[in-house]
Amino acid sequence: GEHPDVSTAVTTTGWPLLDSSRGKAIFVLLGGGDLRADYHSKFPNLESATMFTMSVENTPESAIFSNTNPIGDAEEIQALVEAGYIVRSRADDAGGGEADNNETERRDKAIEIGAHSISTDYPTQVDGIEYWLDLNVRCNPISAPPDCSNDAIE
């Protein structure tokens, strides 16, 4: 492309708009450490790569980040979203008892700070637990243009 690296492209030009993205998929290598380093060595700046990698720090390959702590790291996540990166976060922690207690603070914060992808262990109702995640497609509260309409993106 016209940018020296992926990070510069997403933070200056941005991602393709929804109309030009419909029917397409994004692939992301979730593995980190040596696996990510090996992939980056084969595809410097992700040039000709089939998939993005999950970023942990700002590098030339950065495009998609994962931070599962929307409460404690809210400012960091929101700053990444504002910069143009895609951010994945979590709505709940199955091991932490949040769902058992119908605690929604983590979920609500992930939505509020603009996480694009919000993972859950409760995509449908579970017997004996009130909590479950039912998110509709919506305009991002941080990165969507002012004229964005939820109806237009469904």
Language-model regions, residue ranges each:
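Catalytic cores of phosphodiester-bond hydrolases, prominently lipid phosphodiesterases
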Residues: G1-E154
